[in-house]
Design a protein with these regions (language model features):
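Active-site metal-coordination/substrate-binding segment of hydrolases
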Residues: 6, 13-94, 111-114, 315
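Structural motif
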Residues: 29-31, 52-54, 90-91, 115-118, ...
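Short beta-strand segments
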Residues: 33-35, 93-95, 118-121, 142-144, ...
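Acidic-glycine-rich active-site phosphate/pyrophosphate-binding loop
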Residues: 37-52, 129-142, 261, 292
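Glycine/charged-rich beta-loop-alpha catalytic/anionic-binding loops adjacent to active sites
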Residues: 49-61, 142-148, 266, 298-302
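Acidic/histidine-rich catalytic neighborhood of metal-dependent amide-processing enzymes
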Residues: 58-138, 176, 182, 186, ...
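A short glycine-threonine-serine/GTX helix/turn-capping micro-motif
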Residues: 127-130, 148-155, 191, 246
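Metal-dependent amide/peptide-bond hydrolase catalytic core
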Residues: 142, 159-327
Length: 327
């Protein structure tokens, strides 16, 4: 076997497990990665083995996002050992909290000898991979007014909902251009219909390919809310951060070149695509490790109709085996 260790990512994520790290033959210069958490509970999952695919029974998700990725990496390692194939020095990383905060990959620090990585976590079919993504800013606003009786003394109150509505007047909801979106998805406040609400809290995001553009948009949003608060005699607090930063792995980067060779070796049609979603690959690229997210073929992830085709699962496993031993 190979030694496995657990790091301290649980301290960052607030979970009960850290990342599992498996250095293979010294750890090598590349990473194979998948995440251990699932987007929703898989308690009571009952996998159904159909003629061409694996599904759940429809009452839970299947959890192939990303148990599929874990399975193909472990299968490939086992096959390499059993077939007595020479295994390239590399590191296997099984991360935590990918679905919520990417906290596991945020905590992990690649060694100095690492040059590139592969994440097995995309819903795309094998041969396709995510070579570039947007980044996402997450923000929280707390709008403060002053409570008062809405019928007896409304003049003494400052309505936080009114301030929030004014602040959102110019918010660019939806798709702004081909690589930029914005949304406020959570809002809440007030205690009763006869009380002028003194607090409203809301949460949103901005997704974009460009760091500068994202931060400029965020500052414009803050300015709109602050202007509304000043005009209506309230105040606003804002906290924001990059949930994940954008990346682009170009064709001259090592993982892209290895993917080209891999697809030729397995007679697969290769396609690098752009995604508006994030993955552990975003954090690896942000740490200076060129990393692409490979298609495993998990269809309808996050839903109770999630499934994976046997052919896609086997091809993904063959890809992992080739990366470990040949390509």
């Amino acid at each position: 076997g190979f030694p496995a260790q657990e790091d301290g990512a649980a301290s960052l994520s607030g979970g009960n497990s850290g990342n599992i790290i498996v250095p293979v033959n010294g750890g090598g210069d590349f990473l194979l990665m998948a995440h251990m958490d699932t987007p929703r509970s898989i308690k009571g999952v009952k996998p159904q083995l159909l003629a061409d695919r694996i599904t759940s029974d429809g009452t839970t998700i299947l959890g192939v996002d990303d148990r599929g990725g874990i399975s193909v990496i472990l299968w490939a390692l086992r096959q390499a050992v059993e077939q007595k194939k020479a295994i390239k020095p590399c590191t296997l990383l099984f991360s935590v909290c990918e679905e919520t905060t990417l906290a596991g990959s945020m905590f992990y620090q690649p060694s100095a000898q690492m040059t590139h990585g592969f994440v097995f976590d995309s819903h795309l079919s094998p041969g396709k991979f995510v070579s570039e993504t947007c980044g996402a800013i997450a923000f929280k606003m707390k709008v403060k007014g002053r409570a008062s009786h809405a019928g007896v003394a409304p003049e003494k109150g400052v309505n936080a909902i009114q301030i929030a509505a004014e602040g959102m007047r110019n918010f660019p909801f939806g798709r702004i251009d081909a690589c930029t979106t914005a949304n406020i998805g959570i809002i809440g406040g007030g205690t009763a219909t006869n009380v002028v609400p003194d607090t409203v809290e809301l949460e949103g995001e901005i997704r974009t390919d460009y760091l500068d553009q994202g931060e400029q948009m965020m500052q414009a949003v803050i300015a709109d809310f602050e202007a509304a608060a000043i005009r209506l005699n309230g105040s606003v607090e804002c906290a924001w951060h990059w949930d994940f930063k954008p990346y682009r792995v170009s064709p001259d980067n090592t993982p892209y070149k290895r993917m080209e060779a891999l697809c030729r070796h397995l007679s697969l049609e290769m396609e690098g695509v752009k995604s508006m979603g994030g993955s552990d690959a975003n954090n690896m690229n942000a740490k200076g490790l060129p990393t692409i997210n490979l298609g495993v073929g998990a269809q309808y992830p996050h839903g109770t109709d999630e499934f994976i085709l046997y052919d896609d699962l086997q091809m993904s496993a063959d890809m992992a085996l080739a990366l470990l031993t040949e390509i």
